[in-house]
Amino acid sequence: MMGCQTFSYDDERRLPLYLLNNMLGGPGMNARLNLSLRERHGLVYTVESAMASYSDTGCWSVYFGCDHHDVKRCMRLVLHELDRMMQHPLSERQLATAKRQLKGQIAIACDNREQYALDFAKNFLHYGRERDINVLLTRIDAITAQQIQDVAQQMFAPDRMQTLIL
């Protein structure tokens, strides 16, 4: 597992990081880390990234399962993908695809009544009101490639990363 401290629930950079996280290791088979570590190199059984935001801080992590002799190579490949996100801005097409995928996942999550209830409670606790899904979708549409790159540069510097190997 690799990860770093990240943004609080109220931080404006949280949503661009959420989109970036989804691109890197979200649930889709087209997530960058899945394509690199599993499909291209055949090194992992599973790979995913996750983020959690709290009132005062947050955390972001990458988890992968591999043979013990492949750990260092997998870590190098993860760092390579993070470096790509820091160094190369997304094309308009890549950004549009990522936004469309995330908005689709949100729409599907809204159909899950348990998830909807959890989201409702979380937003009520943090903001005292229900989250307006249309506002969220509009905010996702407003994310720029520059914001994604800025967040990647802020979050993924090698000196910020912590590792845990079991």
Question: Model regions: which residues?
Answer:
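His/Glu-based metal-binding/catalytic segments typifying zinc-dependent metallopeptidases
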Residues: M1-A31
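Short, conserved catalytic/metal-binding micro-motifs enriched in Asp/Glu and His
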Residues: Y18, I148, T163
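A short, acidic, amphipathic alpha-helical segment used as a generic capping/interface helix at domain edges
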Residues: T144-D150
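Short proline/glycine-enriched turn/loop segments at secondary-structure junctions
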Residues: V151-M155
